[in-house]
Amino acid sequence: MKSIVFVALFGLALLAVVCSASEDAHKELLKEVVRAMVVDKTDAVQAEERKCRWYLGGCSQDGDCCKHLQCHSNYEWCVWDGTFSK
């Protein structure tokens, strides 16, 4: 009788461990899916980037910045150059 109770308790403990491991695996899978979605959106944005840098984008020279922007000498980011042409 004692051995049957011991086997039953051992089986329940084993089942609890397996379920816990399964839940952890599910959480890890969910994290991987979310990471993949974020990476895909980042890649899509990078694919649509222009060859020039937008306002406050990092730069090393004026040619890096888009039209009507220039590279700020101290902070190395693109700022408005003060022009208004179309």
From Swiss-Prot:
Pfam families in alphabetical order: Toxin_12
Keywords recorded for this protein, A-Z: Disulfide bond, Ion channel impairing toxin, Knottin, Secreted, Signal, Toxin
Cellular localization per UniProt: Secreted
InterPro entries (alphabetical): Huwentoxin-1 (IPR011696), Huwentoxin_CS1 (IPR013140)
Superkingdom to which the source organism belongs: Eukaryota
PROSITE patterns (alphabetical): HWTX_1
Expression sites by tissue: Expressed by the venom gland.
UniProt keyword Signal present: yes
Entry function: Ion channel inhibitor.
Family named by the database record: Belongs to the neurotoxin 10 (Hwtx-1) family. 17 (Hntx-9) subfamily.
Protein name, as recorded: Omega-theraphotoxin-Hhn1b
Organism expressing this protein natively: Cyriopagopus hainanus (Chinese bird spider)
